[in-house]
Amino acid sequence: MTSLKLLKEKAPLVICITNDVVKNFTANGLVALGASPAMSEFPADLEDLLKYAGGLLINIGTLTDENWKLYQAALKIAEKYNVPVVLDPVACGAGEYRKKVADDLINNYKLAAIRGNAGEIASLVGIDVASKGVDSAGVDNIDEIALAANEKFNIPIVVTGEVDAIAVNGEVVTIHNGSAMMPKVIGTGCLLGAVVASFIGLEKGQELKSLETAMLVYNIAGEMAEKRPNGHLPGTFKVEFINALYEITDEDVKEFKRVK
């Protein structure tokens, strides 16, 4: 299984083209975990950095016409250097423009994985799910949504919710770890996209195990943070979550994982 130890040994450079709201939180989370983040947003700079990158995150949270062009340019450069790309199609079910951008990036460029909540991924495959912007209500068929997207796009899929589902090559696993505090802190989902981008390229041909490890590390760190003093308060949880990402070990993952 792809391990946290391997990530810390390789310390992959992860280029994060992400939304303005979460850049600081994302960078701190990746550093705590053991990756090396770069928040570059200029094509000439990306040309230089992606030569050495282990992953690229495209997060469409703060979407503009200019950012759409940036995503396209970054994806072309990433393909040139064979850098795995994770797409986070934030709120793509909330309106036609976001859906149009997400469809363009999925259908016309090479992606290593797509990570989104149930409402976002369901919108990509035409399944009706109650959603509001970046949030989606509890969904019972999250594994079916993941499989439908995996089959449609032939791309590894991560769907997050009260239970998380990962679908790769027609196989699906569900992750039952996590903290109810995560949705109460802005940026936890966006940071997860960057964590997925950190793990996805560690071992070629092991996408399912890499994604499973990424999700377990992230969710168990959330459980650890919530259990700490005042971890039930959003401000404290945010800080303790970064601390937990720094402290979590492969042994913690092995002991506390709940996978079906």
UniProtKB/Swiss-Prot annotation:
ATP binds at residues 115, 160. Belongs to the Thz kinase family. InterPro entries: Hyethyz_kinase (IPR000417), Ribokinase-like (IPR029056). Catalyzes the phosphorylation of the hydroxyl group of 4-methyl-5-beta-hydroxyethylthiazole (THZ). It catalyses: 5-(2-hydroxyethyl)-4-methylthiazole + ATP = 4-methyl-5-(2-phosphooxyethyl)-thiazole + ADP + H(+). Pathway: Cofactor biosynthesis; thiamine diphosphate biosynthesis; 4-methyl-5-(2-phosphoethyl)-thiazole from 5-(2-hydroxyethyl)-4-methylthiazole: step 1/1. Its EC number is 2.7.1.50. GO terms for molecular function: ATP binding; hydroxyethylthiazole kinase activity; magnesium ion binding. It holds the Pfam family HK. Substrate binds at residues 39, 187. Its cofactor is Mg(2+). The keyword Iron does not apply. Keywords: ATP-binding, Kinase, Magnesium, Metal-binding, Nucleotide-binding, Thiamine biosynthesis, Transferase. GO terms for biological process: thiamine biosynthetic process; thiamine diphosphate biosynthetic process. This is Hydroxyethylthiazole kinase 1.
